[in-house]
Amino acid sequence: MERGRERGRSRNSRADQQNSTGPQFRTRSISRDKTTTDYRSSRSTSQVRVPTVFHKKGTGTLTVPPAPKDVCPTLRKGFLCDSNFCKKDHQLESLTDRELLLLIARKTCGSTDSSLNIAAPKDLRLANPTADDFKQDGSPKLTLKLLVETAEFWANQNINEVDDAKLRALLTLSAVLVRKFSKSQLSQLCESHLRRENLGQDQAESVLEVYQRLHSDKGGAFEAALWQQWDRQSLTMFISAFLHVALQLSCESSTVVISGLRLLAPPSVNEGLPPAPGEYTWSEDSTT
């Protein structure tokens, strides 16, 4: 009798163990199978190749950095500037909210447009000009020499009063000359531009971006966007500053290239150049 009870107890305990542990084993195996299938499915979806559309041209308009502004200090103090010699920016849009409120508080906003120096609108159709817009017949062949001579001529001119066609051509001239500089010289070009215009370092990012994007501009898209989005005064200031700066800067940064080209320069040109680093100039009474 006792043996029969022990057998019954052991049989019942084994059955309880199987009932308690069985579902756990099955659950683990199910979850393991599920994770492996998920892993396989995720791998398979990541390996699926999505067809790529090539040669798709962007139709959106290019974003142009804001034009560098050097606001007139008289305007910032809340007074209208009536000086004919002030070459600072006089557009009210350049003022902060506080400065504009100060100007309104002084009741000076009722002045004429001439005192605010508001520039005339430009011809937006010239953003993408044709050869007919410039009306040139039998013009001379454009060479590097003629390009530099043209830049030297316009650097000494007042371009504030030129017509839209000439201003648009001057923007193209600037873009062409920017691309004659090596890419490593663009930061130096930017620094010289800031110094000439007395602009702060807060304007450096936008000025450098303009030079970089003009340098890599293909098809004149960025050049056209500048014409469309910048006002006439900003274009005039930028072009004028660039033409002065570009003719004074080295267009190459490689010392090997510079020294090699200096070797070929005519004597009259070499006499006016400072000695290259590492070179020594000897006078008649110098001794070794």
Curated annotation (Swiss-Prot):
Zinc finger (C3H1-type) boundaries: 72-90
Compositional bias ranges of the Polar residues kind: 15-28
One Pfam family here: Transcript_VP30
Chain intervals for the UniProt region annotation (Oligomerization): 94-112
Compositionally biased region (Basic and acidic residues): 30-41
Subcellular location: Virion; Host cytoplasm
Region (Disordered): 1-49
GO biological process annotation, one example: symbiont-mediated suppression of host innate immune response
Matches recorded under Gene3D superfamilies: 1.20.120.1160
GO molecular function: RNA binding; zinc ion binding
Post-translational modification: Phosphorylated by host. Phosphorylation negatively regulates the transcription activation. Phosphorylation and dephosphorylation take place in viral inclusion bodies and are largely influenced by the presence of NP. Dephosphorylated by host PPP2R5C; this dephosphorylation enhances viral transcription and is mediated by NP.
Database matches in InterPro entries: VP30_FiloV
Keyword Acetylation annotated: no
Residue ranges, annotated region (RNA-binding): 26-40
Region (Interaction with the nucleoprotein): 180-197
Alphabetical UniProt keywords: Activator, Host cytoplasm, Host-virus interaction, Inhibition of host innate immune response by virus, Metal-binding, Phosphoprotein, RNA-binding, Suppressor of RNA silencing, Transcription, Viral immunoevasion, Viral nucleoprotein, Virion, Zinc, Zinc-finger
Cellular compartments per GO CC: host cell cytoplasm; viral nucleocapsid
Protein's job: Multifunctional protein that acts as a viral transcriptional activator. Promotes read-through of an RNA hairpin in the NP open reading frame to enhance viral transcription. Mechanistically, nonphosphorylated VP30 hexamers form a ternary complex with the viral leader RNA. Clamps the RNA template and the complex VP35-polymerase L together, thereby increasing the polymerase affinity for the RNA template to increase transcription initiation despite the presence of RNA secondary structures. Also assists stop-start transcription at gene junctions to promote transcription of downstream genes.
Quaternary structure, from the entry: Homohexamer; hexamerization is essential for RNA binding. Interacts with the nucleoprotein/NP; this interaction plays both essential and inhibitory roles in viral RNA synthesis. Interacts with VP35. Interacts with host STAU1. Interacts (via C-terminus) with host RBBP6 isoform 1. Interacts with host DICER1; this interaction prevents TARBP2/TRBP binding to DICER1 and thus allows the virus to counteract host RNA silencing.
Family the UniProt entry places it in: Belongs to the filoviridae transcriptional activator VP30 family.
Protein name: Transcriptional activator VP30
